[in-house]
């Protein structure tokens, strides 16, 4: 079963939200593939992962780096899983063809953009019609934290 979590961003940009979610994933020893919109987004995310944590950095690689299989976080624009990740973070507004191969899919969207919200609703409806799926709608709180607002299926803990 794949758990799909829709992260409704209200007060944080994608580039700022990703490092916080990645810290949680790495703390649980999970590997992550981040599916980005384009190369420019990958560069911005990579910069954030290098600088988001004052005590260090979040180890990661991109399509341009050697040995993607070694990377705990792999940033890409392609639907691939070279690091054998169990978590897929989708930032490009798509429904990946092989999403069910992951234990968890995190779909982040800009809650301040009506088109982004409408597209997220369409993706939610699509996933809800799929077998063996648990859905969670996770709303960003004013302080930047997260709260699960709605669940469908058998959910796992929020990332």
Please give the residue ranges for each predicted region:
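Short acidic, S/G/P-rich loop/turn micro-motifs used as interaction or catalytic elements
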Residues: 12-13, 40-41, 80-83, 94-98, ...
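Short, solvent-exposed amphipathic alpha-helical segments in soluble enzyme
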Residues: 21-24, 48-52, 105-106, 122-126
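Acidic beta-strand-to-loop metal/phosphate-binding motif
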Residues: 35, 88-90, 105-109
């Amino acid at each position: 079963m794949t758990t799909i979590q829709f992260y409704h961003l209200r007060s944080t940009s994608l580039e700022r939200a990703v490092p916080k979610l990645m810290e949680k994933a790495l703390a649980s020893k999970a590997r992550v593939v981040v599916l980005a919109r384009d190369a420019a987004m990958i560069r911005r995310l990579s910069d954030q992962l290098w600088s988001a944590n004052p005590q260090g950095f979040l180890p990661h690689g991109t399509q341009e780096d050697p040995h993607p299989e070694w990377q705990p976080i792999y940033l890409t624009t392609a639907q691939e899983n070279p690091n054998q990740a169990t978590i897929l973070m989708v930032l490009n507004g798509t429904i990946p063809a092989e999403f069910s191969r992951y234990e968890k899919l995190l779909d982040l969207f800009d809650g301040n953009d009506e088109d982004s919200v409408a597209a997220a609703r369409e993706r939610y409806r699509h996933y809800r019609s799929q077998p063996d799926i648990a859905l969670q709608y996770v709303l960003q709180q004013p302080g930047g934290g997260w709260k699960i607002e709605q669940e469908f299926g058998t959910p796992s803990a929020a990332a």
